[in-house]
Amino acid sequence: MFKKRNLKWLSILATVIMAWVQLGGALVTKTGSENGCGASWPLCHGALLPQNLPIATIIELSHRATSALSLIVVLWLVITAWKNIGYIKEVKPLCIISVAFLLIQALVGAAAVLWQQNDYVLALHFGISLISFSSVFVLTLIIFDVDQKYEANKVHIDRKLRIYTWTMAICLYVGIYTGALVRHTKSSLAYGSWPLPFNDLIPHTEQDWVQLAHRTLALIASISVFLAFNYAIKHYQNNRTIRYGYTAALLLIILQIVTGALSIFTHVNLIIALLHALIITFEFGLIAYLIVLLLRSQRVEKVKQNAY
């Protein structure tokens, strides 16, 4: 059960399920299915499977079932990885983060159902689960020996690129929080047309302010990704890991902008809205991997300095 040969398929399964949890959470919010099971948790309307199953209940119940399954699969992956490849420096911290944030996510979700948290607290739910997904995603890349295939274990990342990468990660995470807040406050179509309602730029409602904040932070995050990409391409032309990684980050953020604009133009088409959530999930997972490389590079540098 916890054999090394199970690691690859198990890591793919865990990544897919965690991505599905992200999508499920977005679907619950987009369809207004948060109260699909009433104020009852972990049961649904006081039962394991309620007799009356309207669409809101089915969506909420499916999300809870997927979240429970993800906890089982991630725990299985974590135990297997810890046992078989725990000697790799990043594996144990990633295992701990994966499970810890998955549990925190479940508790925040339960609190939202039982005590009806306000929108600003509920928006944290997506960001917390995103950290858990990213940990599983990075663990999967390590399991598939991406480090060896692209010489990622030999990458030296200079101080400037580190600053660009951390700035990119922070801006993106704050932008993701405001995006979740847009969903929870039902502000998707607030503040007029995209990119700006030039005939009336002043926000008038809380929803307008939330939407404007999201667009502003999305712009800042996009600029930070472009600056990191520009520096990486100029100074790391011969390094495949850096070149591919930062190029992928730029392409994903462009797709994110496109789907964000299309969400408004299509009056929040459900498929486009879910695609918007999925793209940012993998974007943050990729940036998490770049941060792991950054920390590894820093660690190697310190070892070399201590050797002298």
From Swiss-Prot:
One of its GO terms (cellular component) is plasma membrane. InterPro entries: COX15/CtaA_fam, COX15/CtaA_HemeA_synthase, HemeA_Synthase_type1. Heme b binds at H214, H276. The active site is at E60. Keywords: Cell membrane, Disulfide bond, Heme biosynthesis, Iron, Membrane, Metal-binding, Oxidoreductase, Transmembrane, Transmembrane helix. It is found in: Cell membrane. GO terms for biological process: heme A biosynthetic process. It catalyses: Fe(II)-heme o + 2 A + H2O = Fe(II)-heme a + 2 AH2. Heme o binds at H63, H125. It is an enzyme of class 1 (oxidoreductase). Residues 1-8, 89-93, 145-161, 237-244, 292-308 are cytoplasmic. Its main location: membrane. It is a multi-pass membrane protein. Interacts with CtaB. Catalyzes the conversion of heme O to heme A by two successive hydroxylations of the methyl group at C8. The first hydroxylation forms heme I, the second hydroxylation results in an unstable dihydroxymethyl group, which spontaneously dehydrates, resulting in the formyl group of heme A. This is Heme A synthase. It comes from Staphylococcus carnosus (strain TM300). The lineage of its organism: Bacteria, Bacillati, Bacillota, Bacilli, Bacillales.
